[in-house]
From Swiss-Prot:
K(+) binds at residues 226, 245, 247, 250. Belongs to the TRAFAC class TrmE-Era-EngA-EngB-Septin-like GTPase superfamily. TrmE GTPase family. PROSITE patterns: G_TRME. This is tRNA modification GTPase MnmE. Exhibits a very high intrinsic GTPase hydrolysis rate. Involved in the addition of a carboxymethylaminomethyl (cmnm) group at the wobble position (U34) of certain tRNAs, forming tRNA-cmnm(5)s(2)U34. Its EC number is 3.6.-.-. It comes from Klebsiella pneumoniae (strain 342).
Length: 454
């Protein structure tokens, strides 16, 4: 599809509503205004007009807004028609507009894509539009808005600019080797490089916070039947999300709850009790439990404190520990402290965190909440942050690795050419975040996840 086409889409959610908005962008937007409204509205002024069919009879009436390019969201001529939000009315108006030559339905995210291609937004800002719409908490929404307003892009652009200056300095040292001053060994380049690396580390720390805000943490509650897994899910969720009985094997499928701990999204997953099951339904539930465990960020290993005094997970259930993916963090949760009389709280045992609590009474659950937040490095005190995606983290990590390699070349062999190449690669990795160096395939994947009218 051509970017020269004029596109139209509904900008409001599908279904009935008080207001429904159609957005038109492109060279033919002016023709749409003349055909549907009978005139071109005054730029950036609300005009109350009938929306006319092909034969001139009104289909609806409402507000028309005209934004001539380049002073519009997409950078093109944009017309917005704000009418009544009935699906039939909007469908009739959409069909009327599509009768005009050169106008087609927009692809998902095509309005934002055009804004990016016309330099109205960089790629990180365009992604922030979708993140703002999908925000699941107030803190995530504020951070997404910061990204949309350019906070993340400004940090990245500052790093790119610093790398540009450093590359100029390094390449000057390479091009003028006969100068009396040895630029590579006089310490100035190393000092500048260390400064850029420190700034990059700070951005990476904020980006990790932003990624947590956007994607959350996946925590799976696992253990033997009747250990109190469903009771813990209910305690963390603050509601009766799971059925709790004294019958072993009550939970036979995966249960999911989405909560927030001081703004950090948490995906809690309750699983079927793990055992050798003869029942086919329970067996399938146990297999699903293992699938969830393998994809978790952390596992809460639930232990019935009345059945064992052991605290080392390898001693409590060695077969379970052996099957866990390598490097998957585990928190041992000894439940039923209200019955055993154990002291509530958090401790460390053989490299694993151990929490004693009572899921039934809720005692010690707040300790677990704080532990989950701290284990992911989530900092609630960070203000003015931004959201980040996995591709952003990967790009920042790649840039950091190139700078480390460059520093090794500088200090190990004074290899200016190799240092310059590592700086170039780091700069390229950072530029992928804002879209300065990004493949068309990646752009297609990013914008295809947007709403149709965005």
């Amino acid at each position: 599809m051509s970017h020269n086409d004029t596109i139209v889409a509904q900008a409001t959610p599908p279904g009935r509503g008080g207001v429904g908005i159609l957005r038109i962008s492109g060279l033919k937007a002016r023709d749409v205004a003349q055909a549907v409204l009978g005139k071109l509205p005054k730029p950036r002024y609300a005009d109350y007009l009938p929306f006319n069919d092909v034969d001139g009879t009104p289909l609806d009436q409402g507000i028309a807004l005209w934004f001539p390019g380049p002073n519009s969201f997409t950078g093109e001529d944009v017309l917005e028609l704000q009418g009544h939000g009935g699906p039939v009315i909007l469908d009739l108006l959409l069909k009327r507009i599509l009768t005009l030559p050169g106008v087609r339905i927009a692809r998902p995210g095509e309005f934002s894509e055009r804004a990016f291609l016309n330099d109205k937004l960089d790629l990180a800002q365009a992604e922030a539009i979708a993140d703002l719409i999908d925000a699941s908490s107030e803190q995530a929404a504020r951070s997404a808005l910061n990204s949309l307003q350019g906070a993340f892009s400004a940090r990245v652009n500052h790093l790119v600019e610093a790398l540009t200056h450093l590359r100029i300095y390094v390449e000057a040292a390479i091009d003028f080797p006969d100068e009396e001053i040895d630029f590579l060994s006089d310490g100035k380049i190393e000092a500048q490089l260390n400064g850029v690396m420190a700034d990059l580390d700070a951005v990476r720390a904020e980006a990790r916070q932003g990624s947590l805000l956007r994607e959350g943490m996946k925590v799976v509650i696992a253990g033997r039947p009747n250990a109190g897994k469903s009771s813990l899910l209910n305690a963390l969720a603050g509601r009766e999300a799971a059925i709790v009985t004294d019958i072993a094997g009550t939970t036979r499928d995966v249960l999911r709850e989405h909560i927030h701990i001081d703004g950090m999204p948490l995906h809690i997953i309750d699983t079927a009790g793990l055992r050798d099951a003869s029942d086919e339904v329970e067996r399938i539930g146990i297999e699903r439990a293992w699938q969830e465990i393998e994809q978790a960020d952390r596992v809460l290993f639930m232990v019935d404190g009345t059945t064992t005094s052991a605290v080392d997970p390898a001693e409590i259930w060695p077969d379970f520990i052996e099957r866990l993916p390598a490097k998957l963090p585990i928190t041992v949760v000894r439940n039923k402290a209200d019955v055993t009389g154990e002291a509530l709280g958090l401790s460390e045992v053989n490299g694993h965190s151990l929490i004693r609590l009572s899921a039934r009474t809720g005692e010690g659950v707040e300790v677990l909440r704080n532990h989950l937040k701290q284990s992911m490095g989530f900092d609630t005190s960070m203000e003015g942050g931004f959201l980040a995606r996995r591709r952003h983290l990967q790009a920042l990590e790649e840039a950091a690795n190139h700078l480390q390699q460059g520093k090794a070349q500088l200090l190990g062999a004074w290899a200016g050419e190799l240092l310059a190449e590592e700086l170039r690669l780091a700069q390229q990795a950072l530029s992928e975040i804002t879209g300065e160096f990004t493949s068309d395939d990646l752009l297609g994947r990013i914008f295809s996840s947007f709403c149709i009218g965005k």
